[in-house]
């Protein structure tokens, strides 16, 4: 994976499924984009499957309910398991 533009800031690691990947940006504004502002701060990388500079992939974010670092698609499972533990 070529991360020469905006080289890796660190390694994103999901606290639920343990998937990990280097990330090249964190925040609401992906680099090399003009009119894109994300609703939440998230970890992302330049899309390794696209030659276009503006394309990016979201890896995950901090869950707004439990504050765990989770990958895309696991937030509901994270919060459901936490609320089940409280019952």
Swiss-Prot record:
Read off the Pfam families from this record.
Answer: C6_DPF (PF10170)
PANTHER family, alphabetically? CYSTEINE-RICH DPF MOTIF DOMAIN-CONTAINING PROTEIN 1, CYSTEINE-RICH PDF MOTIF DOMAIN-CONTAINING PROTEIN 1
Family affiliation: Belongs to the CDPF1 family.
Name of this chain's protein: Cysteine-rich DPF motif domain-containing protein 1
Q: Which organism is it from?
A: Danio rerio
- What taxonomic ancestry is recorded? Eukaryota, Metazoa, Chordata, Craniata, Vertebrata
